[in-house]
Amino acid sequence: MVDFPSRFDVIVIGGGHAGTEAALASARMGVKTLLLTHNVETLGHMSCNPAIGGIGKSHLVKEIDALGGAMALATDKSGIQFRVLNNRKGPAVRATRAQADRAIYKAVVREILENQPNLWIFQQSCDDLIVEQDQVKGVVTQMGLRFFAESVVLTTGTFLGGLIHIGLQNHSGGRAGDPPSIALAHRMRELPLRVGRLKTGTPPRIDGRSVDFSVMTEQPGDTPIPVMSFMGNAEMHPRQVSCWITHTNARTHEIIASNLDRSPMYSGVIEGVGPRYCPSIEDKIHRFADKESHQVFIEPEGLNTHELYPNGISTSLPFDVQLELVRSIRGMENAHIVRPGYAIEYDYFDPRDLKYSLETKVIGGLFFAGQINGTTGYEEAGAQGLLAGTNAALRAQGRDSWCPRRDEAYIGVLVDDLITLGTQEPYRMFTSRAEYRLILREDNADLRLTEKGRELGLIDDQRWAAFCAKRDGIEREEQRLKSTWVRPNTEQGQAIVDKFGTPLSHEYSLLNLLARPEIDYAGLIEATGGEAIDPQVAEQVEIRTKYAGYIDRQQDEIARLRASEDTRLPVDIDYTTISGLSKEIQGKLSQTRPQTLGQASRIPGVTPAAISLLLIHLKKRGAGRELEQSA
């Protein structure tokens, strides 16, 4: 064993989406951070589909961005197609999605990492953790080099005990072309943590020169081109390209159905549970047997490659079956497969063994982020990485941990779901998981989180100045609209009637008019001769005005719930002594050990009546302690 000559405050294991955000967050906060990766060339690598964002996911990306993270800016600099999903629905569920050039995205992330002060990168696999008296002290690499730190963040992705399946054949691997973490997986299984197996998969990659796009439906990006980062702009984007849509058919389904006995999932070879919302094509055919076809989105992997990602046909069937099913799809009759699809099984740890900070309950200073916690997706991983890296740095600084509440961020929803409910399948974020989604929009992530990020030390001066200018601009414009009045039978009044067909019965402020559903901000400014302002400011003014009543109602609901939500439950509370609680509920509470009353209320099977009994118990306990102190 050899000790590295320098000591670190935080060590991050893994250079994927969770690891990069964790390392960057920790370093931005001013603590000495080491990023340990098995291969420097794969930092920020997109292991699965070449896309960032989507329903629920873009909210996480914008929150990462609002806290100074890299994912959104890397997407703006590498995005080759941008679209806003649910554009005809309300702002709460609108979501930005971008196709990214894999090579550019990875290069941008690496550049950000290499230029981040307080961050050191070292290429070596981690084989062991140094743990003394239930506290992590450092790590040991493959060559026996020891690094010491106050906190360690594990972001191992699919590498822990990774097993790759193609047909009935399998081999060890972290992903295609990369070795797994076997020694570390064995070490982790020695810790007093609940462990399970999950699986995910990827489709075969296709050579675009062998595809007939003329029989497919073109899917261009949006115009004007959306932007992902609050600090981004459309000028950052590379050349934009289209995606294409085709479909499976009866012949495709017949090929798959007749070969299910050769599928590792349906022959019992794979034990891990796959993602419900990103099923393999075998799963789709089996679960939705009544459907005659399934969409396949043909996504370009980049501007300087012919490789295509056929989103929708993830598979682990044998190669000969993969080739046959691909060539049964319209437009891909002569397709050449560049890389076969595969499934991968890996270890994950029950997130109910974590605190809100993502620190493990049993090993002090050991944090988990990403797929190790049972999630799926780049965005979910990046969000956890940022939070874990932040809390690892806070711990090194001797400061209190932080996690946003469910009413403050989708990051808060994600973490609360994981540590309260756990997961038996890969967890994916959706807007439907958030009860306060009208407040947790992707467009206002900076207004919700950037001020807190500045307080934590995550936000640099440039981003802070831009945020303050936007926040002040919103306040100024709302005040201007509130104090500007329009009367009937005036030039401005008539302009509004002509523009919107809305007669004015009496004097209105521009803010009152903007609240009307038929009046939009751009048209109102055009009719009344106002000056053009920052589009981000204009968007916020319009949304806040039109949804003011609903937003106020949701804020009132949050205020009512927050009192009990934040009530702390003592660490040493013995649920078996609380009269009135059923044995089942006592067991659930004893196993989960919720930190707050709000968290306890979200445990499946814990009734409102049980929460009332807990509240009564806490009041009695508090009163009893006051009597003891007075005596």
Swiss-Prot record:
It is found in: Cytoplasm. Keywords: Cytoplasm, FAD, Flavoprotein, NAD, tRNA processing. NAD(+) binds at residues 274-288. Pfam families: GIDA (PF01134), GIDA_C_1st (PF21680), SAM_GIDA_C (PF13932). The keyword Metal-binding does not apply. One of its GO terms (biological process) is tRNA wobble uridine modification. It comes from the Bacteria. FAD binds at G14, G15, G16, H17, A18, G19. NAD-binding protein involved in the addition of a carboxymethylaminomethyl (cmnm) group at the wobble position (U34) of certain tRNAs, forming tRNA-cmnm(5)s(2)U34. This is tRNA uridine 5-carboxymethylaminomethyl modification enzyme MnmG. The lineage of its organism: Bacteria, Pseudomonadati, Pseudomonadota, Gammaproteobacteria, Pseudomonadales.
